[in-house]
Amino acid sequence: MNNDLSIYVSKNSGTAVLLLQGNGTDLTCGSEPMAKIVANTTDAAQEKHVPHITKNGNNIDVSVGSVEHPMTPEHFIEWIILVSGDRLEMAKLTPDMKPRAQFHNVTSGTVYAYCNLHSLWKADI
């Protein structure tokens, strides 16, 4: 398994789907086609979306943005995902939480963060 994710979003409903395995058919939400989103790796807006990774031995601490991302009901990080080899681990967030996650026994991989307004962001470990 590589560290790429296939995530599709409905532009009207905001529904996001992580595709683990597909057969080549188009994904839809109701009658609306879903669009595959591509993760951004750089952010001109004061680095508020790119996951910031700190290694502590074989553990990592992830915070979203070198300047902490806001967490309000209108604008927040919905989840952070670690992809490392055959491992996929998710931290689901709510607006009352900090945009942070910890993952254990990690030596390499990619971390993804999804902002409800500004889409998908990633950083390699």
From Swiss-Prot:
UniProt KW keywords: Detoxification, Electron transport, Iron, Metal-binding, Oxidoreductase, Stress response, Transport
Source domain of life: Bacteria
GO biological process terms on file: cellular response to oxidative stress; removal of superoxide radicals
Entry's EC annotation: 1.15.1.2
Binding site for Fe cation: H49, H69, H75, C115, H118
Record-linked Gene3D superfamilies: SOR catalytic domain
Record-stated family: Belongs to the desulfoferrodoxin family.
Note in the entry: The SOR reaction is believed to be advantageous to anaerobic bacteria, in comparison to SOD (superoxide dismutase), because SOR produces no oxygen by reducing superoxide.
Protein name (database record): Desulfoferrodoxin
Species assigned in the record: Clostridium acetobutylicum (strain ATCC 824 / DSM 792 / JCM 1419 / IAM 19013 / LMG 5710 / NBRC 13948 / NRRL B-527 / VKM B-1787 / 2291 / W)
Lineage start: Bacteria, Bacillati, Bacillota, Clostridia, Eubacteriales
